[in-house]
């Protein structure tokens, strides 16, 4: 079993030293969902929300969050991201919005936390913008979909997950 990388021999939290690692292209994809009433989703889709374009605002929030992950998550390295993508898709058949993010860089450490943070903050932004019309929306299923690059190798969720 793998060891926790952010815990030293004394059991204390520490930032991992990545100075000796090789720079490689690293990429991660994550997703999150915001489930809501059909009326709330229709308001977003139809552009009838009084606060403006919910998807555009959530997209910008997700991108900004990925760039600030190091400031939000203890022990994360500040990264020079070369790409952050936040895609939002209304799924009326499930009364939800699906958020999928992608982060990429050439560097010494992975971008999983950046992709997850982007998805989470985009979901939180949708909640924030819509809470006046529905407070019982559910943010859920935030997860890593795939990662590539780095010493630990590639990861991809199974198709049936």
UniProtKB/Swiss-Prot annotation:
The record lists substrate as bound by 75-77, 113-114
From the UniProt record, list the reaction(s) this protein catalyses: (8S)-3',8-cyclo-7,8-dihydroguanosine 5'-triphosphate = cyclic pyranopterin phosphate + diphosphate
- Could you provide one GO biological process annotation from this protein's UniProt record? Mo-molybdopterin cofactor biosynthetic process
Which pathway does the record list? Cofactor biosynthesis; molybdopterin biosynthesis
Report quaternary structure and partners: Homohexamer; trimer of dimers.
Entry function: Catalyzes the conversion of (8S)-3',8-cyclo-7,8-dihydroguanosine 5'-triphosphate to cyclic pyranopterin monophosphate (cPMP).
Q: What is this protein called?
A: Cyclic pyranopterin monophosphate synthase
Q: Which organism does this sequence originate in?
A: Escherichia coli O9:H4 (strain HS)
Q: What is the lineage of its organism?
A: Bacteria, Pseudomonadati, Pseudomonadota, Gammaproteobacteria, Enterobacterales
């Amino acid at each position: 079993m793998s060891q926790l990388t952010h815990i030293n021999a004394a059991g204390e939290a520490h930032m991992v030293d990545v100075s000796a690692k090789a720079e490689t292209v690293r990429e991660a994809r994550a997703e999150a969902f915001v489930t809501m009433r059909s009326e709330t989703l229709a308001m977003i889709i139809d552009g009838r929300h009084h606060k403006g374009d919910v998807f555009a605002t959530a997209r910008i929030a997700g991108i900004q969050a990925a760039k600030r992950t190091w400031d939000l998550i203890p022990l994360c390295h500040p990264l020079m991201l070369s790409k952050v993508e936040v895609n939002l898709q209304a799924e009326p058949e499930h009364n939800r919005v699906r958020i999928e993010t992608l982060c990429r860089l050439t560097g010494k450490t992975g971008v999983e936390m950046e992709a997850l943070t982007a998805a989470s903050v985009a979901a939180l932004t949708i909640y924030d913008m819509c809470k006046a019309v529905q407070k019982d929306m559910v943010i859920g299923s935030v997860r890593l979909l795939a990662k590539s690059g780095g010493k630990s190798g590639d990861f991809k969720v199974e198709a049936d997950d």
